[in-house]
Amino acid sequence: MQILLANPRGFCAGVDRAISIVENALAIYGAPIYVRHEVVHNRYVVDSLRQRGAIFIEQISEVPDGAILIFSAHGVSQAVRNEAKSRDLTVFDATCPLVTKVHMEVARASRRGEESILIGHAGHPEVEGTMGQYSNPEGGMYLVESPEDVWTLNVKNEGKLSFMTQTTLSVDDTSDVIDALRKRFPKIVGPRKDDICYATTNRQEAVRALAEQADVVLVVGSKNSSNSNRLAELAQRMGRTAFLIDDAADIQEAWVKDAACVGVTAGASAPDILVQNVIARLREFGGGEAVTLEGREENIVFEVPKELRVDVREVE
């Protein structure tokens, strides 16, 4: 059985930054550090940080006065941000800069009185945070998930309308929704480049290349990870059997026993150690040496806040 690895896969710059913010805060200030929502959607990462003293909460009211609070990589609404400001808290923002860019687009539309449409998944924390940047009662902020949603949407003024997208969507599905928006609202204005982030796009391209050769595709990522789910869906759409797994223990031998080639990738919030564990598990089932496919090089780095720019090893 051949083992192929997608390239790129795993951590993106936004996830790296968010995890570093929590790790550095723990090193500098000590436990406990409070984090609103899971800092990234990966069980292994969250459990690891929890063991080191991070406390994950959903409501600002759960945080005691004087504590350190970190916003997750998914971002928060202005209401949450203002609630935190009203408290005696030291706040660090781990929102991915590419999510912040979308927040700024929404806030700009709100100030101008333009109505805005967000393409995204209802209930996802990034969507809640992005929708929460809009505050103009004269306008409107709407969420659509599919072309069908677009055709049933009514707005106040089609002449002052813009759209944005969640950063972790399927490139193909989003393109279909954007096409529907432009047909229904010919004057709608969108970003110069859609808001789906480079890491999401690159990992979807890598899965396409992987699925062209693999019989079975294993996507390492947690069930609540939007970008990981999109990778599994894309492989399935290409006619491959695909499984979303948290770690190597999830793999059933029956999934791969008849496969000549198994492809492995990881969502943007999944650490490489989980991929290495999957490779080891597949080798127990008769897999050969893992081969990494050629792919797009990523060298983007997002800096942590200056107050947290320390060498954790020196602090420890």
Swiss-Prot record:
Identify the pathway. Isoprenoid biosynthesis; dimethylallyl diphosphate biosynthesis; dimethylallyl diphosphate from (2E)-4-hydroxy-3-methylbutenyl diphosphate: step 1/1; Isoprenoid biosynthesis; isopentenyl diphosphate biosynthesis via DXP pathway; isopentenyl diphosphate from 1-deoxy-D-xylulose 5-phosphate: step 6/6
What is the top-level taxon of the source organism?
Bacteria
Keyword field contains Protease: no
**What does the UniProt cofactor note say?**
Binds 1 [4Fe-4S] cluster per subunit.
The entry marks the following residues as binding isopentenyl diphosphate, namely H41, H74, H124, S225, S226, N227, S269
The cofactors named for this UniProt entry are:
[4Fe-4S] cluster
Identify the catalytic residues: E126
Give the GO molecular function terms. 4 iron, 4 sulfur cluster binding; 4-hydroxy-3-methylbut-2-enyl diphosphate reductase activity; metal ion binding
Biological process terms from the Gene Ontology for this record are:
dimethylallyl diphosphate biosynthetic process; isopentenyl diphosphate biosynthetic process, methylerythritol 4-phosphate pathway; terpenoid biosynthetic process
Q: What reaction does this catalyse?
A: isopentenyl diphosphate + 2 oxidized [2Fe-2S]-[ferredoxin] + H2O = (2E)-4-hydroxy-3-methylbut-2-enyl diphosphate + 2 reduced [2Fe-2S]-[ferredoxin] + 2 H(+); dimethylallyl diphosphate + 2 oxidized [2Fe-2S]-[ferredoxin] + H2O = (2E)-4-hydroxy-3-methylbut-2-enyl diphosphate + 2 reduced [2Fe-2S]-[ferredoxin] + 2 H(+)
Q: Which residues bind [4Fe-4S] cluster?
A: C12, C96, C197
InterPro entries referenced in this protein's UniProt entry, alphabetically: LytB/IspH
Q: How does it assemble?
A: Homodimer.
- Under which name does UniProt file this protein? 4-hydroxy-3-methylbut-2-enyl diphosphate reductase
**Species of the source:** Salmonella typhi
